[in-house]
UniProtKB/Swiss-Prot annotation:
Its cofactor is dipyrromethane. The lineage of its organism: Archaea, Thermoproteota, Thermoprotei, Sulfolobales, Sulfolobaceae. It catalyses: 4 porphobilinogen + H2O = hydroxymethylbilane + 4 NH4(+). The porphobilinogen subunits are added to the dipyrromethane group. InterPro entries: HemC, Porphobilin_deaminase_cofac_BS, Porphobilin_deaminase_N, Porphobilinogen_deaminase_C, Porphobilinogen_deaminase_C_sf. Binds 1 dipyrromethane group covalently. It is an enzyme of class 2 (transferase). This is Probable porphobilinogen deaminase. It comes from Saccharolobus islandicus (strain L.S.2.15 / Lassen #1). One of its GO terms (cellular component) is cytoplasm. Pathway: Porphyrin-containing compound metabolism; protoporphyrin-IX biosynthesis; coproporphyrinogen-III from 5-aminolevulinate: step 2/4. The keyword Transferase applies. Pfam families: Porphobil_deam (PF01379), Porphobil_deamC (PF03900). Tetrapolymerization of the monopyrrole PBG into the hydroxymethylbilane pre-uroporphyrinogen in several discrete steps.
Amino acid sequence: MKIRIAARGSKLSRIQVDMLGEKLKKIGIEYEIIDIKTKADLFSTEPLSKLGKGVFEKEVNEAVLEGKADIAVHSMKDILSEINPSLEIFAVLERDPPYDILIAEKNLDKLDSNITIGTSSIRRKNFLKYIKPEINTKDIRGNVDTRIRKYLSKEYQGLILAEASLKRLNMTMNYHRLNVYDFTPEANQGIIVALGRKKDEKIKEIFKEINHKDTLDEALAERAVISLVGGGCHSPIGVLFKKEGKEFYGIASYSDGKKKITVSISKPGDPYTIGSELGLLLKKEMKNEDIIP
């Protein structure tokens, strides 16, 4: 059997598909890749905030819905909190490091004033502005290779990226991992997800064999927070859960650049209930501080 996998055509996306494909091969399933151009690819110089929601996923998911592919593979942080009702999460791979990293000559505490850090994430911009208001941020688009090239050419004095992307690309640059209390990661950062048609029971059963249950539980808890509070790649909300045994450890943060709220939770239970509880805690504190997302 050969499974058709739809994904973006970027180098990082190809690597992510191959990571999932290797899991399939181990259970005797072959795969082929169907390259899809998304809105984010077609307007690669535009700020993400101007492109709307779902810019990394919509066209890829449509290929599955239209029967041109069996599975859509994404970096899970790029998919909306509300998935198309005809699609379903079939599997996630074991999570890579979920952290944000700073690529710069110095660590965050020792950065000079009035330098320019490259990031297109409103979450990262606001967290940085809260901690280091004297540092400038500037939008940066393009794949990871392009962004690093701009940094090396001194167009930027630093970059904030996801650690998982450097790991998957096998890049060996020096970087500084950012503390999760200062830079709480985007929901589902570091997770590769496979989406399929809800009615496709045969393929759904195949993907159960490669699903990493603890990672999925972490992902669902984080998505419950975002569903309650509102968020995604255009929102200054970070959330991270770690599951150890039956215990969930969660942290969620919001910043408008002037104020910052961080809440946490630690308890056993099911992902949706615990994620919702953390989301309600965050909403309550945001209301107390008169912050509206």
